[in-house]
């Protein structure tokens, strides 16, 4: 199954099928998104692909090809065209919108823009164009960038007459396969000897993987963590030195060489090409293009005679922009708005895939909504100040208590004047660009849904999202995750009849359609941010246990667990198993928060075997199981109230704490939680602490009591010191 999944997830068009594959087990039917069903009064109609003139209509006529009337029609059409070139009385006759010619080209799809080739530099080597086409089309690297370093003086360490190409691989496996295939192609086609730094040979990779698996088994058996997570296999960066190729030398004027130049060797005729292959994360991390561009700028300042490199423009999202239509008011509602593409150089395309994510982390989610129209850059100061005030309004709302925040949101989406917050929000919204206004409106609806405001519904949020998509506004990753959190928001109600313990199927359908649209817009949905959210959404939101359907009405709540039908319980398990298979097959990297969520789900469902398997996978992933993990573990068992599970956990996990690297020792917070588990597993611990109990439990109990007493003594000392200094009144 892993091989099939890996083969199917290589393109964005197939990824949404992987996410939706688990829905068949639950019976939820997902229909394709009907984006075009949005009314024109609420959203802009989609951009048409092209015009349909009258000369094309005759090609679909029912007459035969050899009909002589066709020639007559053609002659009459030509004569009519010639007559139409002169002004006539009926020249202002109304022309329907569907017969009007569209002169502007349709913008490229965002995925197509990632595969565009960069422009060739001046006097390129003959092999350069073929090299770029092979890198983009055959091995599938995206977001290609080309830097011409032939003007550097002195030349870089890689050699003189250097041209450097940058490309992004989809994964670490794709990176290694692409580099190996590229080197073999150069050897067989051009008889070159490329040097790939960072590429492991096929046999060497197998040996390292076997050694890593052997170490992982030993670590899991010992109950510890891997000391060196970076094993040198997944570097995420391969530098391929193609070598020196013919042609491409820049013509230097005579007398450029400085007087008194001393050196040896011969001047090499040709151009050296280096290809930097990286994963998207590594490319964002090191930002090698910016470093070389700074070197070029410094070189141009030191050598005034050399051409200056083109300055990198600030990153922007290339998308559709809306212009005012020139048609009459009668058919304005029928005319599709013209959407010319923004022409961007290749450096801007590189910034789209990397710099935007980097700026997003620094500025936060409030500034993720970057305008697409180039005219927005020349807005007035009043409009710019409104963009800065909108995030401040959301910050004000987030600092309020939930009840007060709900009151500030008014009656619902149609309410715009009942509170001062709504009045200020819509006043600022009217002065912003349409792209930002649409995104901020979605943010407001998400806030209302997450606060469980009755006036903000998920159906209205998804309708506003469709209008946002139809208008071709940018869809940042942070906005997608925010929308997904709102659609998957759910509060269980065990007291209802029947109990509401899982997310309704209608809400799950909306969330999956959102993920599908995000995948078609180029978002990587095979990521922990998406998969874990879906995993939690299909799971139960409280502690449950399975019973037969005929015994469901008579079953009682036992041990804080609510009875559910075994058929529904097994359906949830099948969905979770499919999602876990997708995570393993796609090699999705999980973090501490994701593992804690998975552990809680398995504990709520009473799947203790899966719980301890996931606990061991944390160590195999190279994540340190520190204080937060053991606080979660002992708190979970204390809330569960099962003395047998608490006793087993104490005997197994307390020695494991001391074997962690670094070890986890008791402090007051951890000691308090462990004491609760000991009191649950051994109720008479105070009376029989010296009799008939394992030595480990007695030792741990004394450690916990000592840590708690020390904490109380320290707090008492601090209070006395503050009282003496006069900072606190004496009681």
UniProtKB/Swiss-Prot annotation:
GO terms for biological process: mitochondrial gene expression; mRNA stabilization. One of its GO terms (cellular component) is mitochondrial inner membrane. Residues 68-93 are annotated as: Disordered. Its main location: mitochondrion. Keywords: Membrane, Mitochondrion, Mitochondrion inner membrane, Transit peptide. Residues 76-90 have a biased composition (Polar residues). It is a peripheral membrane protein. Residues 1-29 form a transit peptide. InterPro entries: Atp25, NT_sf. It is found in: Mitochondrion inner membrane. Belongs to the ATP25 family. Probable mitochondrial mRNA stabilization factor. PANTHER family: ATPASE SYNTHESIS PROTEIN 25, MITOCHONDRIAL. This is ATPase synthesis protein 25, mitochondrial.
